[in-house]
């Protein structure tokens, strides 16, 4: 590890600690050239799949885009930031556990809809109306029946 103060590559680890979640390692280091101390944080690099768009283009998975999609559907709805964070983490975990190198935007959309259905039915309908390209009232009615407990009992 290069010293950020003098640029020397001769450094030693003085202390190592795991954070509470055990996903980050904090290391206190000491430069053997200038005797200054500094802290580094280490995290395992997670490789999320490439996103294949409808037109065939491939892009990097974007946590920010995923979060923005959820937040847009949940705008002005009584859902906590923590719940949104958990939904994003759940979607990422599903993508990682699938072990695929690529995921289609359709697959991502279905994962988002699954999370929104659990979080807020109105947000689910909002997202579904755009994602599934609802063109008439019947499409909305079908989606509402899908999430309405009263409609399922009949």
Swiss-Prot record:
Q: Which cofactor does it need?
A: Zn(2+)
InterPro entries in the record: ATP-cone_dom (IPR005144), NrdR-like_N (IPR055173), RNR_NrdR-like (IPR003796)
Q: Where are the zinc fingers (unnamed)?
A: 3-34
Tell me if tRNA-binding is a UniProt keyword of this record: no
Q: Which GO terms describe its molecular function?
A: ATP binding; DNA binding; zinc ion binding
Q: Which Pfam families match?
A: ATP-cone, Zn_ribbon_NrdR
Cofactor details (free text)? Binds 1 zinc ion.
Look up keyword Cytoplasm and say if it applies. Answer: no
Residue stretches making up the ATP-cone domain: 49-139
GO BP annotations of the record are: negative regulation of DNA-templated transcription
Which keywords describe this protein according to UniProt?
ATP-binding, DNA-binding, Metal-binding, Nucleotide-binding, Repressor, Transcription, Transcription regulation, Zinc, Zinc-finger
- Which superkingdom, per the lineage? Bacteria
* Protein family according to the UniProt entry: Belongs to the NrdR family.
Query: Do you know which NCBIfam families this protein is assigned to?
Result: transcriptional regulator NrdR
Please give the function described in this protein's UniProt entry.
Negatively regulates transcription of bacterial ribonucleotide reductase nrd genes and operons by binding to NrdR-boxes.
Supply the name of the protein: Transcriptional repressor NrdR
Q: Which gene encodes it?
A: nrdR
């Amino acid at each position: 590890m290069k010293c950020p103060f003098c640029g020397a590559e001769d450094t030693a680890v003085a202390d190592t600690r795991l954070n509470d979640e055990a996903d980050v390692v904090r290391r206190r280091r000491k430069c053997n050239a200038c005797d200054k101390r500094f802290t580094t944080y280490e995290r395992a690099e997670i490789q999320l799949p490439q996103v294949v768009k409808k037109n065939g283009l491939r892009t990097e998975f974007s946590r920010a885009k995923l979060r923005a999609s959820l937040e847009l559907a949940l705008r002005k709805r009584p859902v906590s930031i923590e719940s949104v964070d958990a939904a994003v983490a759940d979607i990422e975990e599903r993508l990682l556990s699938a072990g695929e190198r690529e995921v289609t935007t359709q697959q991502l959309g279905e994962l988002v809809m699954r999370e929104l259905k659990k979080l807020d039915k109105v947000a689910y309908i909002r997202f579904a109306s755009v994602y599934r390209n609802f063109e008439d009232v019947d499409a909305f009615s079908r989606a509402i029946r899908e999430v309405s407990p009263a409609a399922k009992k009949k």
